[in-house]
Curated annotation (Swiss-Prot):
It is an enzyme of class 2 (transferase). The keyword Kinase applies. Belongs to the pyruvate, phosphate/water dikinase regulatory protein family. PSRP subfamily. This is Phosphoenolpyruvate synthase regulatory protein. Coiled coil: none annotated. The gene is ppsR. InterPro entries: Kinase-pyrophosphorylase, PSRP. The keyword Transferase applies. ADP binds at G157, V158, S159, R160, C161, G162, K163, T164. Its EC number is 2.7.11.33, 2.7.4.28. It comes from the Bacteria. It holds the Pfam family Kinase-PPPase. Keywords: Kinase, Nucleotide-binding, Serine/threonine-protein kinase, Transferase.
């Protein structure tokens, strides 16, 4: 067995496997182990299920350690094949459905692809999500200042502090129309809030970052440049943070947070409603 890997983990579903991945990853993060993840979506027929079973069994025979299998599968005949494998199998949805069934006195009606599939009941939500993504792409990095009033939040910050990935995550995960505006080196001699943003101050949210981390990120993009120098990064961060304080713009330091955590903090601080897709 590879000494760098403590356990092999399978995420298996008859749909996208997103649910299995998210819940399985949340569970595995509780343990101090290194894992090798294998995600297998759209296991919808017996032939594919047998191939998945063989893959699980092969790893068991190769390593001598049972793979961990997190699965979400509707059809019982497909589930039965997976359960015949040498893996330690956990039905992540059924573990929650069974007690809820008792509490609500209702029988579940499982349907494949219900969680992330399209149907007449969620088309409007899906269209709104795509519109949010289109808007966010069109308003990335100050590309366009038109229709800024349609943004639900406008992120500010120096170059490479995490504005773009956070904006896209907000749009894709929560359907939030997000614009972002960069403060560049040329702005620093007289840094003020642009006139186009002043009427929208209630929508502004600032990101900052530790100068040392910013310099390391920029160094990968433009090696040995003034843009990436620690001195330049310190100056830009100090100026932008002063701007936030002066204009009472809420802000967070993104250095030690993941994109998911940054986005969630923005939603919470700005009072934006989370939308589930």
């Amino acid at each position: 067995m590879d000494n760098a890997v403590d356990r092999h983990v399978f995420y298996i579903s008859d749909g996208t496997a997103i649910t299995a991945e998210v819940l399985g990853h949340a569970v595995m993060s509780q343990f101090p182990v290194t894992i090798s993840s294998i995600t297998l979506p759209f296991v919808e027929n017996e032939s594919r299920a047998r191939a998945v079973k063989d893959q699980i069994d092969a790893i068991y025979h190769q390593t001598g350690v049972r793979p961990l299998v997190f699965y979400s599968i509707v059809l019982p005949e497909i589930r039965a094949i997976i359960l015949q494998s040498e893996g330690f199998c956990q039905d992540i949805v059924q573990a929650l459905v069974a007690p809820l069934q008792q509490e609500m006195k209702l029988d579940p009606t499982p349907i494949a692809h219900r969680t992330h599939g399209l149907n007449p009941n969620n088309l409007n939500k899906y269209d709104a999500r795509i519109a949010a993504i289109d808007y966010t792409l069109a308003h990335d990095d100050g590309i366009s200042l038109r229709n800024l009033d349609q943004a639900q939040v406008i992120l500010l910050g120096v170059s490479r502090c995490g504005k773009t990935p956070t904006s896209l995550y907000l749009a894709m995960q929560f359907g939030i129309r997000t614009a972002n505006y960069p403060f560049i080196a040329d702005d620093m001699d007289n840094l003020v809030l642009p006139a186009s943003l002043k009427p929208l101050q209630h929508k502004l949210f600032g990101l900052t970052i530790d100068p040392e981390r910013l310099a390391a990120i920029r160094e990968e993009r433009r090696e040995n440049s003034r843009y990436a120098s620690l001195r330049q990064c310190r100056m830009e961060v100090a100026e932008v943070e002063a701007l936030y304080r002066k204009n009472q713009i809420p802000w967070i330091n993104s250095t030690n947070y993941s994109v998911e955590e940054i986005a969630t903090k923005i939603l919470d601080i700005m009072g934006l409603s989370r939308r589930m897709y």
